């Protein structure tokens, strides 16, 4: 310091250089806490800000390399702990702190970076349920992005071998921690999408510290998951660990083993489910078949035995005829009795006038009797005509008379309604309006073929 006691004139540059040397020699590394203000990060990649407290402030600079290594984004008003060295910016004669490390006060840098990135991606909609895709129930090809030597891949293989072995596994090996791991993971996700024909993808690793899992909190991984065309299941760490990848993925699994359990169903459980469904289907088919058989039997009886229906109509005609005969007889008997009575009364009265009056009355009664008999007979004839018309309308014989026939399969004589009931060599009986014929089936056509195929004999 003797230099300053002697009268030695220094230039501004020399003095500034001297002060700079003193600062850099005595303050190689200092830790300073304060509040960020006037933050500016131009295109050069360097970051400039002021660190202040209630009594003073100091200019700071963080060069591009150090700034890029930060896990969080500094903002004005944020209280931070800064590490760096003091120097002097000679053009302005201002001393400044060249920072190489920043840490938010009250919360770790990684945690701050996690919160900031989560807020950013949430605003962009990357976590929205609208983007979530359904995980296929029975995937055939599964892609896995993880370390080839870690516990995660061993756990996944163990679960797959235990639950269902008929799946194809495509592993894309990557580093899951350290510098460059995030980029490798993102590239692997893109590569598996380019491979194609994948049904689902598992992206993950085993447990670890926040620093160990940090690659899955990087923005590059989140965006790779979001643009993936293949549904992605994130399986990072243990059940209590949450990463940005978990929020972007279509589904989060607590562990890699849990992810394998989700994508691959148990073969034993599937077999039991198929057996149960098969049994239910068999029971349902049996019930429908029984109902169909009962209906066919009832219809067959009605068609194969028309005499029952005809007999019912014949009984009705006989009943009407007997009723008509009975009522006509009653009318005649009543008239005969009245004639006898009148004849007796007439025989007791000799005057010609009385005789003439009774003759006229007798004629009137005879005429009324004729009219009554005519009306009764007309009504009876009309009833018989209606019954006969109904009988002819429903009679299979009337249908047969128009050129149709009834085919019965022998020996059961069941009525054939479809060609699917017949097979070559079957014996059938064909009934016509007059007579019947025994035939042998040479060929049976499907229902659709019968409309276009040329007629063939059976």
Swiss-Prot record:
Annotated signal sequence range: none
Pfam families associated with the record: Exonuc_VII_L (PF02601), tRNA_anti_2 (PF13742)
Name of this chain's protein: Exodeoxyribonuclease 7 large subunit
Subunit structure and binding partners: Heterooligomer composed of large and small subunits.
Keywords, sorted A to Z: Cytoplasm, Exonuclease, Hydrolase, Nuclease
Location in the cell: Cytoplasm
Main location: cytoplasm
Name of the top EC class for this enzyme: hydrolase
Species this protein is from: Citrifermentans bemidjiense (strain ATCC BAA-1014 / DSM 16622 / JCM 12645 / Bem) (Geobacter bemidjiensis)
């Amino acid at each position: 310091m003797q230099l300053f006691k002697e009268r030695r004139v220094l230039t501004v540059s020399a003095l500034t250089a001297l002060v700079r040397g003193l600062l850099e020699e005595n303050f190689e590394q200092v830790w300073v806490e304060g509040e960020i203000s006037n933050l500016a990060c131009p295109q050069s990649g360097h970051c400039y800000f002021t660190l202040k407290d209630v009594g003073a402030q100091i200019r700071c600079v963080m060069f591009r390399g150090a700034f890029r290594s930060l896990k969080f984004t500094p903002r004005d008003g944020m209280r931070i702990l800064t590490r760096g060295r003091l120097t002097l910016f000679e053009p302005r004669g201002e001393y400044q702190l060249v920072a190489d490390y920043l840490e938010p006060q009250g919360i770790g840098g990684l945690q701050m970076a996690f919160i900031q990135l989560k807020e950013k991606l949430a605003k962009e909609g990357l976590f929205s349920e609208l983007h979530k895709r359904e995980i296929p129930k029975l995937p055939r090809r599964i892609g896995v992005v993880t370390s080839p030597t870690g516990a995660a891949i061993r756990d996944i293989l163990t679960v797959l071998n235990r639950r269902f072995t008929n799946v194809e596994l495509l592993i894309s090996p990557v580093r899951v921690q350290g510098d460059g791991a995030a980029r490798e993971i993102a590239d692997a996700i893109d590569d598996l999408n380019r491979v194609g024909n994948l049904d689902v993808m598992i992206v993950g690793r085993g447990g670890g510290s926040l620093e160990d899992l940090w690659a899955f909190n990087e923005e590059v991984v989140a965006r790779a998951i979001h643009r993936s065309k293949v549904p992605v299941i994130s399986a990072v760490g243990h059940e209590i660990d949450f990463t940005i990848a978990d929020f972007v993925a279509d589904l989060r699994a607590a562990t890699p083993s849990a992810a394998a359990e989700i994508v691959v169903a148990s073969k034993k459980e599937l077999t039991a489910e198929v057996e149960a469904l098969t049994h239910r289907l068999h029971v349902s088919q049996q019930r429908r078949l029984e109902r169909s058989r009962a209906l066919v039997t009832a219809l067959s009886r009605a068609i194969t035995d028309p005499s029952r229906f005809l007999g019912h109509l014949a009984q009705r005609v006989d009943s009407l005829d007997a009723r008509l005969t009975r009522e006509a007889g009653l009318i005649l008997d009543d008239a005969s009795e009245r004639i006898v009575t009148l004849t007796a009364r007439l025989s007791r009265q000799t005057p010609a006038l009385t005789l003439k009056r009774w003759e006229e009355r007798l004629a009137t009664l005879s005429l009324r009797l004729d009219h009554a008999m005519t009306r009764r007979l007309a009504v009876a004839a009309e009833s018989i005509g209606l019954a006969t018309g109904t009988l002819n309308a429903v009679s299979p014989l009337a249908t047969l008379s128009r050129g149709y026939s009834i085919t019965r399969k022998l020996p059961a004589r069941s009525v054939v309604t479809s060609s699917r009931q017949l097979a070559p060599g079957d014996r059938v009986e064909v009934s016509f309006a007059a007579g019947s014929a025994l035939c042998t089936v040479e060929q049976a056509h499907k229902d659709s073929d019968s409309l276009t195929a040329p007629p063939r004999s059976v």
